[in-house]
Amino acid sequence: MLDPRARTLLKTLIERYIADGQPVGSRTLSRYSGLELSPATIRNVMSDLEELGLVSSPHTSAGRVPTPRGYRLFVDTMLTVETPIDAEAVARQVQHTLQAGEPQQRVVAAAASVLSNLSQFAGVVLTPRRSHVFKQIEFMRLSDKRILLIIVTPEGDVQNRMLATPRDYSPSQLTEASNYINAHFAGLSFDEVRRRLRDEIDQLRGDMTTLMHAAVTASTEVPDTEDTVLISGERNLLEVADLSSDMARLRKLFDVFDQKTGLLQLLDVSSHAQGVQIFIGGESTLVPIEEMSVVTAPYEVNGQIVGTLGVIGPTRMAYNRVIPIVDITARLLSLTLSQQ
């Protein structure tokens, strides 16, 4: 699409604009590009890039700035993402914050805070989807015909359900029932347990069948918790010159944070892809803000993708720094959650 000269000038322009935040003129391009070109030649190349929609000219300046389309070409074909010099420091900070053994929700919230602190933009995390399978269950007798059902998910979440039964059960009977379910059905969804109980009903005593069906019904009737988006560091964006000078733009951005619907859908889409994803400007109709970019990566528990995290910042962000931050945080969050 572009000849080597035009690619070099576009790359230089974007790098200088990211560094300085000012429209880039031909003198700056001549100084930093390493090309021996006259100002007139550089201006001609800039005109060509503008016709291609890769740069634009602010009315108040003779220089040019990259467009979202220009950023996309830069990220896809010109950006060299290297392990940052402070990668070990980044990893140490993430590991220090994401403590294994902490409740899952606290660990995930800490990841959003880490992303915000390291990037100096907004950190976002789509929390893990609630599991439809169980790792272990336990019955506890509360009183006559009242039983507490304790469900432990593979992610370590503990859920409690109250059961009202037509008859009373002794502690030994409750232990027998929970041992049977854990031995035969652990790792399955409750819908699958229900199907298997129908097949095995002749092998079970009637009182045990009644109790097990009550447990399965109680577990499947409670609706799943909705996916939740955690956001940290929104105020960092007030310090971004590109945004803070435009109240309408800021209001639109904080509407996205407040409603969360588009952000939730964007993070959910990202969870179906491998590795780091980058959404620049208005590319995503889910977060349609021209001046903003979102860098995301999925995270896992025991090899299974359970959520997505990322950074929201201006299109004029240092992608070569933000991408490794998102990638390292996703990997270490996956490791921490898998160790729980």
From Swiss-Prot:
Descriptive protein name: Heat-inducible transcription repressor HrcA
Function: Negative regulator of class I heat shock genes (grpE-dnaK-dnaJ and groELS operons). Prevents heat-shock induction of these operons.
Single GO term (MF): DNA binding
InterPro entries: GAF-like_dom_sf, HrcA, HrcA_C, WH-like_DNA-bd_sf, WH_DNA-bd_sf, WHTH_HrcA_DNA-bd, WHTH_transcript_rep_HrcA_IDD
PANTHER family to which the protein is assigned, alphabetical: HEAT-INDUCIBLE TRANSCRIPTION REPRESSOR HRCA
Transcription regulation found in the keyword field: yes
Pfam families cross-referenced by the UniProt entry: HrcA, HrcA_DNA-bdg
Species whose genome carries this gene: Burkholderia ambifaria (strain MC40-6)
Sorted UniProt keywords: Repressor, Stress response, Transcription, Transcription regulation
Superkingdom to which the source organism belongs: Bacteria
Record GO biological process: negative regulation of DNA-templated transcription
